[in-house]
């Protein structure tokens, strides 16, 4: 009875060692998941900042294009008025003003288009960063659960070891009596 109880104690000690090794592994994996989450959060924050800047650039380009469009409309109105009764030089100046306004409008629209394209790319990058952050959070939750399960396994193994030691003590006591 004593040798069987001693074997049970050894088996229980082995089980505790295995459970502790599993817990150590789970904790290492958890630490890795936590650092990945921190990195993903940082990448998301950075992407959000770039997105905000791109949105500001787009808004500014929209405003400039609107102003250039208004200036072009005004220049065409001035040209129409000059056609009605201005002298040659005034008419030529009004025509030049329309040409300049047209060029400025084309340039503003090109910038506007480029800003829009950049904004779309940045929005895509921000969406990817959000997806990666969500994945990292889900992974961390799973690793936390695994670590909790491993800790529970250590407790269960320790309880089994305590019970095996009690049985061994009882067998030794019975043998002594």
Segments from the language model and where they lie:
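Extended amphipathic alpha-helical heptad-repeat regions
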Residues: 1-177
């Amino acid at each position: 009875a004593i040798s069987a109880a001693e074997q049970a104690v050894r088996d229980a000690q082995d089980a505790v060692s295995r459970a502790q090794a599993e817990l150590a592994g789970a904790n290492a994996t958890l630490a890795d998941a936590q650092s990945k989450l921190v990195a993903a959060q940082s990448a998301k924050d950075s992407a959000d900042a770039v997105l905000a800047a791109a949105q500001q650039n787009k808004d500014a380009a929209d405003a400039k294009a609107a102003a250039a469009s208004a200036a072009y409309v005004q220049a065409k109105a001035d040209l129409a008025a000059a056609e009605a009764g201005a002298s040659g030089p005034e008419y030529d100046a009004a025509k030049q003003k329309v040409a300049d306004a047209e060029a400025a409008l084309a340039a503003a629209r090109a910038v506007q288009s480029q800003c829009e394209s950049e904004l779309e790319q940045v929005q895509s990058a921000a969406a990817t960063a959000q997806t990666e952050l969500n994945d990292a959070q889900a992974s961390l939750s799973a690793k936390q659960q695994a670590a909790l399960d491993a800790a529970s396994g250590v407790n269960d193994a320790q309880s089994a070891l305590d019970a095996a030691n009690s049985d061994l003590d009882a067998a030794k006591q019975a043998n002594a009596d």
